[in-house]
Amino acid sequence: MAHQKYGAQALLTSIRFGHSTYRSQILARTDDESIKSLADLKGKRVAFVDPASTSGYLLPLKLFKDRKIKTGKTVFAMKHDNVVSMIYQKQVDAGATFYTPPAEGEIQDARRLVFAQYPDVEKKIKIVELTDEIPNEPVVFRKGIPEAMKSKLVDAFIELARRPDGKEALTKVSSITDLKKSSDAEYKAVREMLTALGKSAESLMRL
């Protein structure tokens, strides 16, 4: 949206645990036998993160819309770990959070955020369905920066991400483990999702 309105360019994409894309997951309690597929969430209580969260609301909302599934009462928990906790505590029937594939034999999705409180969360909460993938967040450059300077900045960011101190800093800030070159074309799916939902970047920024 910033590309269309202001001429901004996405020239880098974040990488986490070797993945440059991510998706959302729909979670429910493992012992809830009434929920075996997404269709079973019709009329159920569902927790989302917040109205501006891509993985915690917009991607799941698009999934429900595409499948023509109307849930029951919805709540915004404001944080991904809160969504998981609400499901664990049976405050809601299901919830939507970010999904990251397992790495080194351990889960990396939102359930890991509550391991300290609920060591058995992986057994107690199941993944009902995953959404389609979209690219991780980009590094965006404003309109008007000379091409030569943009090229140097892109290379500098990539070099930073691959230096031990740079990797450590990026990991601490946002769990970013690397960066790769990209383009605005790679974010077409995100723009199409917002259009399908009748959303705009401006409306989400006001939330």
Question: What residue ranges belong to the model's regions?
Answer:
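Short, glycine-/small- and polar/acidic-enriched structural segments
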Residues: 1-34, 101, 131
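An extracytoplasmic/periplasmic, membrane-proximal ligand-sensing/linker region
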Residues: 145-207
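Residues that flank catalytic or metal-binding motifs in active/ligand-binding sites
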Residues: 22-24, 42, 135
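Pocket-lining segment of extracytoplasmic ligand-binding domains
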Residues: 32-34, 44-148
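Sec/Tat-exported extracytoplasmic proteins
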Residues: 3, 30, 50, 68, ...
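Extracytoplasmic/secreted envelope proteins and their assembly/folding machinery
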Residues: 23, 38, 57, 61, ...
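Immediate post-signal peptide segment of exported/extracytoplasmic ligand-binding proteins
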Residues: 34-45, 197-207
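Alpha-helix boundary recognition
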Residues: 3, 42, 88, 116, ...
